[in-house]
Amino acid sequence: VNITESIDVHTQSNWITGKAKNMVIRRNANSITVQGSLPKYQYGNNLQTLQRADTGLIIEELSDLIRTDLSKARLQRVDFSTNIITEHKPQYYYRFLGHLTRFYRHSDNSSLYYNQGCKKLLFYDKIKDAKAKQMLIPKQYQNKNVLRYEMRLLKQVKKFFKRDVLANDLINKQLYNY
């Protein structure tokens, strides 16, 4: 764990920042912020799908690392994703994904986006993305067409779920049936 100390020039708050694998952990007298990808923390990539039980173990591991129980931490941003192995290149399927009410639809050569303020839906070629980021591609995805779907709640997680979502909710199956 690399640890640095800094002072926020706007608030004069003293921050301690540490990094564990891909996770950045910031702490001051009033709050703790943990940023990063749980699958990347666990597997070193985000191609593999993280199981709910593994999510709980990661929360425990990070809690032990910083000596603070993170299970009751309020989530400010959540990304949900899955990979779909397809017959054709992912871009082939974009034309079948029409418009979505109250979302702005935008596509480029390799991705399809649906934007609605703090909520974003993305479809893209995960293998192309992984290669561009020089990620190791797990064997089950090598030489495959992989369509990645992501739903990103960039803010207002509470508004979307109509309640505070805590870190330990990530292991609860009902959260994913919403």
Show which residues each predicted segment covers.
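Structured, helix-rich domain cores that form ligand/interaction pockets
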Residues: V1-Y178
